[in-house]
């Protein structure tokens, strides 16, 4: 009997709570429809209605329960507790849209602060428009009730009055970087401010533009004198006759040995050697190529002496030429005399005198018994 009574009481309690649950569900659905139908771009609008509590009628809050053991226990939850629970659920559902709206307001405020602190009057007028509706209200409400900072108010004032910055510059007042600390004095270096260098945030600063001045002609001349290039050494200096050891430079009032005064024909080598007016100039020897030797006129001990390449070839006479080759397993050395004035060829052969002053036969030619390569020149020498 007690169990049947308990079941009947529970059914009646469920029937009482069901209408209240349906009413709260319909209120939540209506609230969601209102949120979804609102304009998403209306960020700065009045949303004070979001903080209003939703009052829903509730049924009788007292319920009596009985246990099978016979002990009765009365539970009387108040209507205020039910309302607080429903308000917490509703606030939990609405916290996400409210947080998104507040984050959007903060982003707009940060953008407005950045435009007011880092751009000049021209960029502010372009970004905020010509005083029309740019999407940001002049004084958007603060949902959380936090006090606004002085920097934000100052930025709003500068955005509303863009001509104030130009007046400050015309009066020569020091300009501060919006949203940051003031610029250091001129005496301080860029390494101050606790190791952080401060750059000017505005391109219209009078302190920055005061550095870019037109230089005076005196400054330009000083810079040109300082930056004038020094004469660079293109290389080692050429050796002059005065610096060459063992030589003597001619006096300035004399003519060189190779030149001749005007009005005179060019002199020959013999005149230079015999003349006493010109300085003594050593004539470089003409060196024959390797493989040939010059011959002196004075043999020693009855044998011909073949001097080296340093012999003087200007003396008239003969030179001894040799050719060495192999024949039938033997090394053959052929030698003959040629006039000094004749050409020296790669393939040695007998040459005729060109200057017509060289002797036909010298002492070395007389010692030749036979001519290994007879030719008309050899026959003429031996006939004579």
UniProtKB/Swiss-Prot annotation:
Transmembrane segments: none annotated. The keyword Phosphoprotein applies. One of its GO terms (cellular component) is host cell cytoplasm. The keyword Cell wall biogenesis/degradation does not apply. One of its GO terms (biological process) is symbiont-mediated suppression of host cytoplasmic pattern recognition receptor signaling pathway via inhibition of MDA-5 activity. One of its GO terms (molecular function) is metal ion binding. It holds the Pfam family zf-Paramyx-P. Zn(2+) 1 binds at residues 318, 337, 362, 365. Residues 7-20, 83-101, 150-168 have a biased composition (Basic and acidic residues). Residues 50-59, 191-206 have a biased composition (Polar residues). Keywords: Host cytoplasm, Host-virus interaction, Inhibition of host innate immune response by virus, Inhibition of host IRF3 by virus, Inhibition of host MDA5 by virus, Inhibition of host RLR pathway by virus, Interferon antiviral system evasion, Metal-binding, Phosphoprotein, Viral immunoevasion, Zinc. Residues 1-23, 38-318 are annotated as: Disordered. It comes from the Viruses. It is found in: Host cytoplasm. Its main location: host cell. Zn(2+) 2 binds at residues 341, 353, 355, 358. The modification Phosphoserine is found at residues 68, 125, 192, 249, 257, 260. The P/V/C gene has two overlapping open reading frames. One encodes the P/V/W proteins and the other the C/Y proteins. Belongs to the paramyxoviruses V protein family. Interacts with host IFIH1/MDA5 and DHX58/LGP2. Interacts with host IRF3. Interacts with host RIGI regulatory protein (via CARDs domain) and host TRIM25 (via SPRY domain); these interactions prevent TRIM25-mediated ubiquitination of RIG-I and disrupts downstream RIG-I signaling. The C-terminal zinc-binding domain is involved in binding to IFIH1/MDA5. This domain is also involved in viral pathogenesis. Plays an essential role in the inhibition of host immune response. Prevents the establishment of cellular antiviral state by blocking interferon-alpha/beta (IFN-alpha/beta) production and signaling pathway. Interacts with host IFIH1/MDA5 and DHX58/LGP2 to inhibit the transduction pathway involved in the activation of IFN-beta promoter, thus protecting the virus against cell antiviral state. Also interacts with and inhibits host IRF3. Blocks the type I interferon signaling pathway by disrupting the RIG-I signaling pathway. This is Protein V. It comes from Sendai virus (strain Harris) (SeV). The gene is P/V/C.
């Amino acid at each position: 009997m007690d169990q049947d009574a308990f079941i009947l009481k529970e059914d009646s309690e469920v029937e009482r709570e069901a209408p209240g649950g349906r009413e709260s569900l319909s209120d939540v659905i209506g609230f969601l429809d209102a949120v979804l139908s609102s304009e998403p771009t209306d960020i700065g609008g009045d949303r004070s209605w979001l903080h209003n509590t939703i009052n829903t009628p509730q049924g009788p809050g007292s319920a009596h329960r009985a246990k099978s053991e016979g002990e009765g226990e009365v539970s009387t939850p108040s209507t205020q507790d039910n309302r607080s629970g429903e308000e917490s659920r509703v606030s939990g559902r609405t916290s996400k849209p409210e947080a998104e709206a507040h984050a959007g307001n903060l982003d707009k405020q940060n953008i407005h602060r950045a435009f007011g602190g880092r751009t000049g009057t021209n960029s502010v007028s372009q970004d905020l428009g010509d005083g029309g509706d740019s999407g940001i209200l002049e004084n958007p409400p603060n949902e959380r009730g936090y006090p606004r900072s002085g920097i934000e108010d100052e930025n709003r004032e500068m955005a509303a009055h863009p001509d104030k910055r130009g007046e400050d510059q015309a009066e020569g007042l020091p300009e501060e970087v919006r949203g940051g600390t003031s610029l250091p004095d001129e005496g301080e270096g860029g390494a101050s401010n606790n190791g952080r260098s401060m750059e000017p945030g505005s391109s219209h600063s009078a302190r920055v533009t005061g550095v870019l001045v037109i230089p005076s002609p005196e400054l330009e001349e000083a810079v040109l004198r300082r930056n004038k290039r020094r004469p660079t050494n293109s290389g080692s200096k050429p050796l002059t006759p005065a610096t060459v050891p063992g030589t003597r430079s001619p006096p300035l009032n004399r003519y060189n040995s190779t030149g001749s005064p005007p009005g005179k024909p060019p002199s020959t080598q013999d005149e230079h050697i015999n003349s006493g007016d010109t300085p003594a100039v050593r004539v470089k020897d003409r060196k024959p190529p390797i493989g040939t030797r010059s011959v002196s006129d004075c043999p020693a001990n009855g044998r011909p002496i073949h001097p080296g390449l340093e012999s003087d070839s200007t003396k008239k006479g003969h030179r001894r030429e040799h050719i060495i080759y192999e024949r039938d397993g033997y090394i053959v050395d052929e030698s003959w005399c040629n006039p000094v004035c004749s050409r020296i060829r790669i393939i040695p052969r007998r040459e005729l005198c060109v200057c017509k002053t060289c002797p036909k036969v010298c002492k070395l030619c007389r010692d030749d018994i036979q001519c290994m390569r007879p030719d008309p020149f050899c026959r003429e020498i031996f006939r004579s």
